[in-house]
Amino acid sequence: MLSDCEFDAARDTIRRALHEDLRYGLDITTQATVPAGTVVTGSMVPREPGVIAGVDVALLVLDEVFGVDGYRVLYRVEDGARLQSGQPLLTVQAAARGLLTAERTMLNLVCHMSGIATVTVAWVDAVRGTKAKIRDTRKTLPGLRALQKYAVRVGGGVNHRLGLGDTALIKDNHVAAVGSVVDALRAVRAAAPELPCEVEVDSLEQLDAMLAEEPELILLDNFPVWQTQVAVQRRDIRAPTVLLESSGGLSLENAAIYAGTGVDYLAVGALTHSVRILDIGLDL
């Protein structure tokens, strides 16, 4: 279910999207071809199997176009439903002109969100039987982060930080600026002792230094499988409360191998930065 903040973000996104479509005038094609007052029944229907996310977002689009009482919902599925090609996810009755005006914004958002949910399910299924969780990143499309991260949750994934201020994540450029990974961690802890702190390492030497400091999480950047196994062994012996996350070089084909090493998370930027949409159409 969308949180209040996600609802607000969805409304903002929808208003911008509708403005993009209508800033130069009304839908001239629809105005010319569809008689005023025509009422139709329309269904959003996937053209391929997938996991649905964004049904409430589609309804928010209709709210913007019609008002909350300007259309009737005849059928809907809940987010997370796994549908086959041809199975409707949403059926509404509404004025044809308004529905055609809303069509592209509804489809753009629901196709994108359902694509994210579908690929996230594939990753979650790939690591099933291990303790590893699939986690997203900040590699999101500008303006769509809240909806993309919601879709990851629909698919069974876990959200990483929403912005730069809710968790500290020390990366290579921070280390370069301050001099060492230990100095970077200590600087962050001094500045924001109340925040959880995560540290990216790219070698076993950096890992050893961080295990001595015990941050909340250590991100293993582009570690091959053997190095990841060593990292888990050292963590288990020296700092068992520290979480480990694998990042870089991950694929659906090797996800189970990395998850089987004992890491806690797999960081998957591809969930959001380059996901393929789920093909969905609106049928009247």
Swiss-Prot record:
One matching Pfam family: QRPTase_N
Protein name: Nicotinate-nucleotide pyrophosphorylase [carboxylating]
Sites where the protein binds substrate: R104, T137, R138, K139, R161, K171, E200, D221, S247, G248, G249, V268, G269, A270
SS bond partners: none
Family, per entry: Belongs to the NadC/ModD family.
Matches recorded under InterPro entries: Aldolase_TIM, NadC, NadC/ModD, Nicotinate_pribotase-like_C, Quinolinate_PRibosylTase_N_sf, Quinolinate_PRibosylTrfase_C, Quinolinate_PRibosylTrfase_N
Keywords, alphabetical: Glycosyltransferase, Pyridine nucleotide biosynthesis, Transferase
Function text: Involved in the catabolism of quinolinic acid (QA).
GO cellular component terms attached to this protein's record: cytoplasm
Subunit structure: Hexamer formed by 3 homodimers.
The species this protein was found in: Mycobacterium leprae (strain TN)
EC code(s) of this entry: 2.4.2.19
Ranges in coiled-coil conformation: none
Sequence intervals crossing the membrane: none
UniProt-recorded Gene Ontology molecular function terms: nicotinate-nucleotide diphosphorylase (carboxylating) activity
GO biological process, alphabetically ordered: NAD biosynthetic process; quinolinate catabolic process
Pathway: Cofactor biosynthesis; NAD(+) biosynthesis; nicotinate D-ribonucleotide from quinolinate: step 1/1
Reaction catalysis annotation: nicotinate beta-D-ribonucleotide + CO2 + diphosphate = quinolinate + 5-phospho-alpha-D-ribose 1-diphosphate + 2 H(+)
